[in-house]
């Protein structure tokens, strides 16, 4: 309403196969595949014009004081593309076999989740690279990986259309169910001190390294929502 009142034109570009203002998901999968196979756009960075902005906040001396944490995965598009190619050519060969193993999956999974979340690389770029690589073999593992890229967009699409799930149970039978929350238990969960070894190991791992594979992330969230909330 505020944008309309100020006569501001809002331009929003579709990304990662999620469709805004979709009435239902009946044909969503078909639309998703169409979007994933569409040509990638040329960014034409050389045509961009820089903004001249004088400030003393970004001095070279300041950046020299910054240091990277060796435990944390590096960011940026260049590193994201390198991680993608390493996964497709090498690590994906053990993808399905090791996907449920908390430790081994740290290398056999794509390690692209953080890059996708931060916008270092698009799902369409990842999809097309993995799809083309299937012709070189390893089809079963790469197909499984491609299906999980669709899952990523599916869950965001679901939240796009059912925003109330952030506050209300998906199963309406639980709407009137009231359970007290123990905030101390939740704080202990946040620190990895629940006393349950696998849950605590997963939480401490993600706090230290910034990464946890899909199934271990699901474990942490499931424990929180089913046992503590």
For each predicted feature, which ranges?
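Active-site "lid/cap" and pocket-lining segments within catalytic core domains
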Residues: 1-146, 156
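Active-site-proximal binding-pocket segments
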Residues: 108-229
């Amino acid at each position: 309403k505020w944008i309309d009142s100020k006569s501001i034109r809002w331009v929003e570009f579709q990304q990662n196969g999620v469709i805004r203002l979709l009435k239902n998901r009946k044909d969503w999968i078909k639309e998703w595949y169409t979007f994933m196979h569409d040509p990638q756009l040329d960014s034409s960075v050389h045509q961009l014009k820089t903004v001249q902005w004088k400030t003393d906040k970004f001095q070279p001396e300041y950046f020299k004081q910054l240091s990277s944490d060796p435990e944390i995965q590096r960011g940026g598009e260049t590193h994201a593309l390198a991680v993608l190619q390493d996964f497709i050519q090498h690590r994906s060969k053990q993808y399905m076999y090791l996907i449920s193993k908390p430790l081994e999956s740290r290398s056999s999974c794509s390690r692209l989740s953080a890059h996708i979340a931060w916008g270092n690389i698009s799902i369409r770029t990842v999809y097309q690279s993995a799809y083309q690589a299937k012709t070189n073999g390893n089809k079963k593992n790469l197909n499984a990986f491609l299906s999980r890229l669709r899952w990523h967009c599916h869950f965001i699409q679901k939240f796009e259309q059912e925003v109330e799930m952030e506050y209300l149970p998906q199963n309406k039978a639980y709407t009137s169910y009231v359970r007290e929350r123990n905030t101390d238990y939740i704080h202990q969960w946040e620190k990895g001190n629940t006393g349950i070894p696998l849950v605590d190991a997963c939480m401490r791992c993600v706090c230290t390294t910034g990464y946890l594979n899909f199934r271990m992330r699901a474990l942490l969230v499931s424990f929180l929502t089913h046992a503590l909330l």
